[in-house]
A protein has these predicted regions:
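Low-complexity, Ser/Thr/Pro-rich intrinsically disordered linker/stalk segments at domain junctions
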Residues: 3-136
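HKD-type phospholipase D/PLD-like phosphodiesterase module
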Residues: 111, 123-196, 201-307
């Protein structure tokens, strides 16, 4: 995995550093950086959380990231769900995601494990880590992490208690996708008749707008073949219904045999009969997979990997 997820397009998109027993693991996508923190159990006594400071070398900015949990005793008047600096109210979790990252930016994150007491924090251990987000315009790899937080306070702050379908102009779906679905659309839409073909293997295959896009692409003359899971009622029936509604049955093969689920989620793009790129990752071709669950998509422009 290190060969794929290490250095890409001249930058580092995955990095792990350890100092004084404090380990930080960071993985960058195109619009997000994911973090995992590890501190020896013996050092966790009195731990209050983690402060995250970010230097944006691309835009020459420097600041602490914000979060929405705070210490009641030192709350300056914030209401539940409001944002505050992690300098004073550190993150109370061993994993975090910076969804304010921008494509093609170079960042230095300094993560500090804080002890002491609310209002008088004492740094216990600190790790600085350099990372670069992917740029869709260059390189052989693009990685997309959706937000996948339909039930989170961040969603409620922006859209209230409304379901994504009830938010005007699809803005809730755009926010939840964080570029993932748009990249999926582009992967399919960039095909041309007589030059490209698509080979799709799917487990959940029932997001109607995506199937509609595939039908339109097929109607343009692009060769498309699809195999999807139909071993059991779920997701088999949803898949069958969606395929019929999209008029894609002629391009599909139903996987009905086997003792295991066909948990596939990839698209191979062929150019002049040869595999040239692949869309893969953990994202099902369903509304829940694309917008609801926390998921990742990885586009690899490499003939050998695509094959």
């Amino acid at each position: 995995m290190s060969g794929i997820f290490g250095k890409m397009a001249g930058g580092i998109m995955r990095e792990t550093k350890t100092k004084s027993g404090f380990k930080v693991h960071a993985i960058a996508g195109t619009y997000v950086v994911l973090f995992g923190f590890d501190l020896p159990r013996a050092d966790c006594n009195g731990l209050l959380g983690f402060s995250l400071h970010r230097v944006d070398h691309t835009e020459n900015e420097s600041y602490y990231l914000e979060a929405n949990k705070f210490f009641a005793g030192t709350n300056p008047g914030l209401k539940p769900g409001e944002q505050h600096s992690t300098k004073d109210h550190p993150i109370q979790s061993f994993q975090w995601a910076d969804y304010t990252a921008k494509p093609g930016h170079k960042y230095t994150y300094t993560i500090t494990a804080q002890k002491g007491a609310p209002g008088t924090l004492v740094p216990h251990a600190e790790v600085a880590i350099d990372i670069e987000t992917e740029s869709p315009e260059g390189g052989n790899h693009d990685v997309y992490f959706n937000r996948g937080v339909a039930g989170s306070q961040a969603y409620v702050r922006r859209f209230g208690d409304r379901a994504p379908d009830d938010v005007e102009n699809n803005q809730a779906f755009v926010w939840l996708s964080r570029g993932l679905y748009e990249a999926m659309e582009e992967f399919v839409s960039s095909t041309t008749r007589g030059r490209h073909a698509l080979r799709i293997a799917a487990y959940e295959f029932h997001y109607a707008p995506f199937l509609k896009l595939l039908q339109e692409t097929k109607a343009r003359g692009v060769d498309i073949e699809i195999v999807y899971d139909a071993r059991k009622k779920e997701p088999g029936k949803k898949n069958d219904d969606a395929v019929r509604a999209a008029r894609l049955s002629g391009a599909c093969t139903k996987r009905t045999e086997g003792s295991y689920i066909s948990h596939n989620k990839f698209i191979v793009k062929l150019e002049n009969g040869r595999p040239v790129s692949v869309w893969t990752g953990g994202t099902n071709f369903s509304e829940g997979g694309i917008f609801g669950h926390s998921n990742v998509a990885h586009v690899v422009e490499d003939n050998e990997i695509a094959a």
